[in-house]
Amino acid sequence: MAKIINVIGREIMDSRGNPTVEAEVHLDGGFVGMAAAPSGASTGSREALELRDGDKSRYMGKGVLTAVANINGQIRDALMGKDATAQAELDQIMIDLDGTENKDKLGANAILAVSLAAAKAAAAFKGMPLYAHIAELNGTPGQYSMPVPMMNILNGGEHADNNVDIQEFMVQPVGAKSFREALRMGAEIFHNLKKVLQEKGLNTAVGDEGGFAPNLASNADALAVIKVAVEKAGYKLGEDVTLALDCAASEFYKDGQYDLSGEGKVFDSNGFSDFLKSLTEEYPIVSIEDGLDESDWDGWAYQTQILGDKIQLVGDDLFVTNTKILSRGIENKIANSILIKFNQIGSLTETLAAIRMAKDAGYTVVISHRSGETEDATIADLAVATAAGQIKTGSLCRSDRVAKYNQLLRIEEQLGEKAPYKGRSEIKGQA
């Protein structure tokens, strides 16, 4: 048995200079797993709670010593002597110990860090890579694929201090034959975008996720400069490379309207969906995430009606990796894809349940980082293990982002043909 003999929590730093939670799970026999919880900037209101201390004298209230104390106390006591390979049982023990709907007693950051650390310790005990262990937990052993990266090369919204309203402008190297080639294509486009911005006298500082964050006259201008960068890199837009947006529309939804203050436009719900549709007609945008506010379900129904059979409509704040909310979306035919962020729900077991529910309903799955990240690369293993098909982990800059890409390179090298890169067919509506 992979007997747990110690659980340790500590406060570490994330990529934005804020504290986050790291956990270690130690097993009999010297096996150890270590994992860290990420943190979001644009967060859905129904996400599991990230427990912060609120003590303004430390880290402006963002300390996580309470969550760490919960790991070193109640969680450790509850898990001592348990089998680390019994992931669902461990996660349920922590969920029951917390006893709240959104994990606000122990903190989703505490529970998640321990959940992932236990999975890593169990993989070490079994003598297998983390992705292989997660695939077994998922009931899909040996069924792997390399994900198409959604590379956030131009940032706006909550991820940047500029006047661009849409939060993320991404490229997807759908024409690549392997993940390694996809990564190279993305890097070449990223460097060419820097040159394009410099030639225009625009800022080349980067945002939270490593993408450039210039001031531009409109959101369409962001697409225009990316188009030039793709062509300068020697690729065909729409053929080799497609585009994706994360609107994070909840961030500019005010009093029932969508206020694009950066370009001085205000839309009602259907009007904003029509605006997005017009962008898809001008550019090869094949995926739009959070194109409306998380509570605007009538608007989502309209957006799905006009765009859902043509492109991928991804629910992030809409679904918050929560099977209860996702099942309602499936029932009402809202969106056709889900973004998976395991700190939105707070455990590996619940994350895998959301992935299975989405796939069973014919929704696509995009595994995602958060804007506040660490060097922890667990999402790379998760994407391959579940054959999710797509991953969103930032730009080709900042080691907190590149750590995930490098782990995917290692995994592809290990698995070879057992983990195919399927490109365009992974994206809803593009097969």
Curated annotation (Swiss-Prot):
One of its GO terms (biological process) is glycolytic process. The keyword Secreted applies. Its cofactor is Mg(2+). The active site is at E209, K341. The keyword Transmembrane does not apply. CDD domains: enolase (cd03313). SMART domains: Enolase_C (SM01192), Enolase_N (SM01193). Its main location: cytoplasm. GO terms for molecular function: magnesium ion binding; phosphopyruvate hydratase activity. Binds a second Mg(2+) ion via substrate during catalysis. GO terms for cellular component: cell surface; extracellular region; phosphopyruvate hydratase complex. It holds the Pfam family Enolase_C. It is an enzyme of class 4 (lyase). InterPro entries: Enolase, Enolase-like_C_sf, Enolase-like_N, Enolase_C, Enolase_CS, Enolase_N. It comes from the Bacteria. It catalyses: (2R)-2-phosphoglycerate = phosphoenolpyruvate + H2O. Catalyzes the reversible conversion of 2-phosphoglycerate (2-PG) into phosphoenolpyruvate (PEP). It is essential for the degradation of carbohydrates via glycolysis. Component of the RNA degradosome, a multiprotein complex involved in RNA processing and mRNA degradation. Belongs to the enolase family. HAMAP family: Enolase. This is Enolase. The lineage of its organism: Bacteria, Pseudomonadati, Pseudomonadota, Gammaproteobacteria, Alteromonadales. The gene is eno.
